[in-house]
Design a protein with these regions (language model features):
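Phosphate-coordinating loops and pocket residues in cytosolic domains that bind phosphorylated ligands
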Residues: 8, 293, 590-593
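Short, intrinsically disordered, charge-balanced linker/junction segments flanking boundaries
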Residues: 16-21, 196, 465, 549-553
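Extracellular glycan-associated modules
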Residues: 420-595
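Twin-arginine (Tat) signal peptide motif
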Residues: 1-5, 153
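N-terminal export signals
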Residues: 5-21
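Asp-box/BNR beta-propeller blade signature and adjacent active/binding-site loops
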Residues: 22-422
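A short acidic/small-residue loop/turn micro-motif
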Residues: 16-17, 21, 64, 94-95, ...
Length: 595
């Protein structure tokens, strides 16, 4: 027997397992299934609080033009049915006044709702000295930190507005106005912990090109009495962190949109975005006065970095003490090798589930939360709502904002990944003569291949699975000359392909090691992902993306009824399962842990 003839199939049984659930005709992850939130034209940051009368109060920034145009202002709307329908818009600040933007709500225990926002109080019409004539006309990210309140659950708002004193820092003194005009905006929705309220925001230094907010640092406001003090003139405020510097990135000049949560021991954890190809995180153990040094966010302490573009990367804590991170799962060092558009590729939205351990957050491998069939859609600025055991998320694409109910099992799966030892149901384990189960059309359907493999060498052109016809129609999994696994899809008309990560990092191939491998073909967002040894490939050091899109026009990729399984493999293959559905990341990790 030559090495080309050898294949190990230990543990193979030909059993069709019961399907996990009946097919779902509506994919909740598709953003078009959500419920629209009213707006004027442009719409941003649809943030929700549940008021003491049981209704949802959503506040948002809107305007008849595009982002940053005159007439941009802040409004409220109310829902009595968990976001399915909404009231007419209620002005908090009018469209005919100075720009009012980036509104964030806080509900006090006694029922008052405050909103905090950037207000162009002095009605400046141009940013002097800006290097872009177009951006010089944009005056929605400067002025004063203002707030108003409502004592009737958002139906009416105080006539008076109040202002938070803002301590100048180095980044302010170095702006175009030497700190006499402040540039800032906030997206870090207020949180409450131990009788204090916090919210996050970014101070802006240089304004203009490239990127509009050329320099920024993360900061926080804290009030120790806003939850009980009913005279808004007596509310105290502390700008954090102490000193002259805010939260910064390890390399680049951008540290935007700090977003805080509280840990069980009173520590604070914050995420913020950069232009470095990763998001950042920081911990404070003293109520926000000081923070850990600049560091890219990692899935676990000293673990691999979380790739992310210049987009919202929000963290949320739920009543069960667990966390959720919204991000976009691409970036890395490879972005610096060529031209990169940091504001692009906000579709799909990914989440990681977080658990607290030893005063740190450990993040799960990512899952797709939301997608749009148009890759250019840019969904962002979410808010998460929890009510009566159900979970919801809001998001905006700048011209449409929606509410979505989240499948609770998606979140539970992410939170429980580390302990999951269950084999995902619905798989067929192939055994001789390797009759290939029929796969669904990729037009809305999907499939997963799941197997264990050990290579004696990583030479190219090894074949793990192949059911292609002479015309090429079918699927194949092979090994490339980069020591990566390669999936080929062909429906007789169109061909798509994607391969696993190269290199030596987590989720890559080694000689002599048993690997658990899954490749997921998801016909909802039309995305292929590789998961190797419980690590969802993120592109590693070489690629910006570890996940790839396949042609959305692909349909029937069934090839020959009998597959060739390991006809040219220098190694062993075990437990090759074929699923006629996409598996969630958490299901694949359950298979990995199950052994």
């Amino acid at each position: 027997m030559t090495r080309r003839d050898f294949i190990g199939t230990a543990g193979a049984t030909s059993t069709l397992l019961q399907a996990a659930a009946a097919p779902n005709t509506e994919d909740r992850r598709n953003i078009t299934t959500g419920w629209p939130i009213p707006k004027e034209g442009y719409v941003d940051q649809p943030y929700v609080v549940i008021t003491n009368d049981g209704k949802w109060l959503c506040v948002l920034t809107t305007g008849s033009g595009v982002e940053g145009k005159p007439g941009q202002h802040i409004v409220a709307t109310i829902s009595s049915d968990q976001g399915r329908t909404w009231s007419s818009l209620i002005d908090i600040e009018p469209a005919n006044g100075p720009e009012a933007s980036w509104v964030m709500p806080l509900k006090t225990p006694y029922g008052r709702v405050y909103v905090f926002y950037t207000y162009n109080k002095d009605n400046l019409r141009e940013v002097a000295g800006c290097n872009s004539p177009a951006l010089a006309k944009r005056v929605d990210t400067l002025g004063y930190y203002a707030y108003k309140y409502s004592d009737d659950h958002g139906r009416t708002w105080s006539h008076d507005r109040y202002y938070i004193p803002m301590r100048r820092m180095r980044i302010d003194r170095e702006n175009l106005y030497a700190g006499k005009v402040l540039f800032f905006w906030g997206v870090g929705k207020p949180i409450i912990d131990r009788g204090r309220a916090y919210f996050g925001f970014a101070k802006v230094g240089k304004w203009g090109n490239p990127g509009t907010m050329v320099q920024s640092q993360g900061c926080f406001m804290r009030s120790d009495n806003i939850l009980t003090e009913r005279d808004p003139n007596k509310i105290n405020w502390i700008l954090l962190p102490d000193g002259d510097e805010g939260l910064r990135a390890p390399k680049g000049p951008v540290s935007d949109e700090a977003n805080p949560v509280a840990l069980s021991d009173g520590s604070l954890y914050a995420t913020y975005r950069t232009v470095d190809g990763y998001n950042c995180h920081a911990y404070s153990r003293d109520g926000g006065h000081t923070w850990t040094p600049p560091a890219y966010a990692t899935y676990a302490p000293l673990g691999r970095r979380i790739k992310h573009s210049r987009a919202a990367n929000f963290v949320k804590k739920f009543s069960n003490g667990k966390f959720l991170l919204w991000y976009h799962n691409h970036g890395g060092e490879s972005i610096h090798a060529g031209k990169w558009e940091p504001y692009a590729n906000r579709n799909p939205a990914w989440i990681a589930g977080g658990i607290e351990k030893d005063s740190h957050i450990y993040w799960s491998e990512p899952e797709i939360l939301l997608y749009d069939l148009d890759p250019a859609t840019r969904m962002s600025y979410p808010d998460f709502i929890e009510e009566n055991g159900k979970f919801y998320v809001t998001e905006t694409q700048k011209t449409i904002a929606r509410v979505h109910e989240i499948d609770r099992s998606l979140l539970e799966g992410a939170w429980n990944q580390r302990d999951n030892r269950t084999v995902a149901p619905g798989g067929v384990i192939l055994e001789p003569p390797f009759a290939m189960p029929r796969l669904p059309s990729l037009s809305g359907g999907g499939f997963t291949l799941d197997f264990r493999i050990r290579f004696r060498e990583l030479s190219p052109n090894q074949v793990i699975l192949d059911n292609r016809e002479a015309s090429g129609k079918g699927i194949a999994v092979t090994l490339t000359d980069r020591a990566t696994l390669h999936l080929s899809l062909h429906d007789g008309r169109l061909r798509s392909e994607w391969e696993s990560d190269a290199g030596t990092g987590p989720g890559t191939l080694e000689v002599g090691k048993w690997h658990h491998v899954a490749v997921i073909v998801d016909g909802g967002p039309n995305i292929i992902t590789w998961i190797i040894d419980g690590v969802l490939n993120d592109g590693g050091a070489v690629r910006e993306f570890g996940w790839g899109r396949f042609n959305p026009k692909m349909e029937d990729i069934n090839g020959t009824p009998t597959a060739k399984v390991a006809p040219a493999l220098f190694g062993e293959l075990r437990k090759l399962r074929v699923y006629d559905r996409y598996l969630r990341t958490s299901e694949v990790i359950g298979n990995f842990h199950a052994g």
